[in-house]
Amino acid sequence: MARTAPTSNEERGDGLREKMISVNRVTKVVKGGRIMGFAALTVVGDGDGGIGMGKGKSREVPVAVQKAMEEARRKLVKISLKNGTFHHTVVGQHGASRVLIQPASEGTGIIAGGAMRAVFEVMGVQNVLAKCLGSTNPYNVVRATIDGLMKMSTPSEIAAKRGKSVEDITG
């Protein structure tokens, strides 16, 4: 059914890292027969906490990938990192996919599977522990990962909510 292409990692002149996660062959059934096409899923990151996801469809693979990359660039969001990892543990969800993302100590590396690994690599995360729970559909896993990252809050945001200083929060 769905074919996953090997992930490619490119860096363009604008300093953004691009990674193709999957390319699927899709079929539209019409009165005259079947129309074949391709759907591509990509992520783009700036290596400093910026991440964007895009999907594109077309009759040819390169056009689908290009559309996906353009959408990913438009949807770029910034996530706060702390020394190449995250501030706290978080769970993200999309559809039947749930992801658990935990900060890791220096030297751990990226311990995450498939689509999540691609997201962390283009973001510039060096140390993270992540687990995919439920569906492993690449689209849902990437959306769940970004959902979890959007839920992440910095110590300064938590301190502002509680009306305390950052030192009280970080201990």
Swiss-Prot record:
Source domain of life: Bacteria
Signal peptide: none
Domain S5 DRBM: 16-79
GO CC annotation terms, alphabetical: small ribosomal subunit
GO MF terms, alphabetically ordered: rRNA binding; structural constituent of ribosome
Stored Pfam families: Ribosomal_S5, Ribosomal_S5_C
Keywords: Ribonucleoprotein, Ribosomal protein, RNA-binding, rRNA-binding
UniProt xrefs under SUPFAM superfamilies: dsRNA-binding domain-like, Ribosomal protein S5 domain 2-like
Subunit-structure text: Part of the 30S ribosomal subunit. Contacts proteins S4 and S8.
UniProt family annotation: Belongs to the universal ribosomal protein uS5 family.
Function according to Swiss-Prot or TrEMBL: With S4 and S12 plays an important role in translational accuracy.
Annotated domain remarks: The N-terminal domain interacts with the head of the 30S subunit; the C-terminal domain interacts with the body and contacts protein S4. The interaction surface between S4 and S5 is involved in control of translational fidelity.
Record-given protein name: Small ribosomal subunit protein uS5
Annotated organism of origin: Thiobacillus denitrificans (strain ATCC 25259 / T1)
Source lineage: Bacteria, Pseudomonadati, Pseudomonadota, Betaproteobacteria, Nitrosomonadales
Name of encoding gene: rpsE
